UniProtKB/Swiss-Prot annotation:
UniProt entry tagged with the keyword Mitochondrion: no
Superkingdom of origin: Bacteria
Pathway in which this enzyme or protein is active: Sulfur metabolism; hydrogen sulfide biosynthesis; sulfite from sulfate: step 1/3
Biological role stated in the UniProt entry: With CysN forms the ATP sulfurylase (ATPS) that catalyzes the adenylation of sulfate producing adenosine 5'-phosphosulfate (APS) and diphosphate, the first enzymatic step in sulfur assimilation pathway. APS synthesis involves the formation of a high-energy phosphoric-sulfuric acid anhydride bond driven by GTP hydrolysis by CysN coupled to ATP hydrolysis by CysD.
HAMAP family named in the record: Sulf_adenylyltr_sub2
Keyword ATP-binding found: yes
InterPro entries hit by this protein: PAPS_reduct_dom, Rossmann-like_a/b/a_fold, SO4_adenylTrfase_ssu, Sulfate_adenylyltrnsfr_sub2
Broadest EC class assigned to this enzyme: transferase
Protein name, UniProt field: Sulfate adenylyltransferase subunit 2
GO MF term set: ATP binding; sulfate adenylyltransferase (ATP) activity
Species in which this protein is naturally found: Salmonella paratyphi A (strain AKU_12601)
Length: 302
């Protein structure tokens, strides 16, 4: 890795650690949202650096839908145990009682009830006033205009027209009773930065990011990996083994794989350098207006 790239990554690292420390010092009850993906892995790594040799002064929170890949659940538990992190897992009990699932109820309703409402329930239950998230500005247009300190009202709603200026790395964390913030320490990172940093720091990631032969079928213009027996095959659908990997991870029925032979980090980085498609092209929840990212964030999404 050339010196210019290395210096750039260290600048990003320094900024992120500064943000994490600022929030830990400024807020009474912060939490780190842990979605198990590559960005969460980098954010957790930075947080551990920020407070080394001590332990994290806040817990991890996973809002579970019940539909993550099995490898993600195994990785989550292994990581929390290895690092001695306090891990809170919340699943919307009302959604569970209603039997909400992406196949029957669709991506928009599933995401709203199991993720957005589940997140708000967890934040209210534990009284968190600041929640770290791994979103980056290069991922999606609504995230591109969101501040590092993203203020939410007492209903956890985001108003993009009412954001505070962030000048010279000075962040205004003053909130009223009942309000909270979402904090995005990776805002200025790109997908390429994330992969370069994972390689540089030897950060452990879910194996689904690396290409392997996996059982997939084609549905709604995406390659769906069949992760368990809850799927109902539609007429004409055939499950085949193909060399695929994932650029982004979520609920397995809503996350499309990409055909790839990149089985190492350098191969992923090389693949990203020539990619002309969006990182979130395989996320079903981003495809319709009802499920648009900005609308979901206005309603309290991550």
């Amino acid at each position: 890795m050339d010196q210019k790239r290395l210096t750039h990554l260290r600048q990003l690292e320094t900024e992120s650690i500064h943000i994490i420390r600022e929030v830990a010092a400024e807020f009474a009850n912060p939490v780190m949202l842990y979605s198990i993906g590559k960005d969460s892995s980098v954010m957790l790594h930075l947080a551990r650096k920020a407070f080394y040799p001590g332990t994290l002064p806040f817990p991890l929170l996973h809002v579970d839908t019940g539909w993550k890949f099995r490898e993600m659940y195994a990785f989550r538990d292994r990581t929390a145990n290895a690092y001695g992190c306090e891990l809170l897992v919340h699943k919307n009990p009302e959604g569970v009682a209603m039997g909400i699932n992406p196949f029957v109820h669709g991506s928009a309703k599933h995401t709203d009830i199991m993720k957005t409402e589940g997140l708000k329930q967890a934040l209210n239950k534990y009284g968190f006033d600041a929640a770290f998230g791994g979103a980056r500005r290069d991922e999606e247009k609504s995230r591109a205009k969101e501040r590092i300190y993203s203020f939410r009202d007492r209903f956890h709603r985001w108003d993009p027209k009412n954001q505070r200026p962030e000048l010279w790395r000075n962040y205004n964390g003053q909130i009223n009773k009942g309000e909270s913030i979402r904090v995005f320490p990776l805002s200025n990172w790109t997908e390429q930065d994330i992969w370069q940093y994972i390689w540089l720091e030897n950060i452990d990631i879910v194996p689904l990011y690396l290409a392997a032969e996996r059982p997939v079928l084609e549905r709604d213009g995406m390659l769906m990996m069949v992760d368990d027996d809850r799927i109902d095959l539609q007429p004409g659908e055939v499950i085949k083994k193909r060399m695929v990997r994932f650029r982004t991870l979520g609920c397995w029925p809503l996350t499309g794989a990409v055909e790839s032979h990149a089985q190492t980090l350098p191969e992923i980085i090389e693949e990203m350098l020539v990619s002309t498609t969006s990182e979130r092209q395989g996320r079903m929840i981003d495809r319709d207006q009802a499920g648009s990212m900005e609308l979901k964030k206005r309603q309290g999404y991550f």
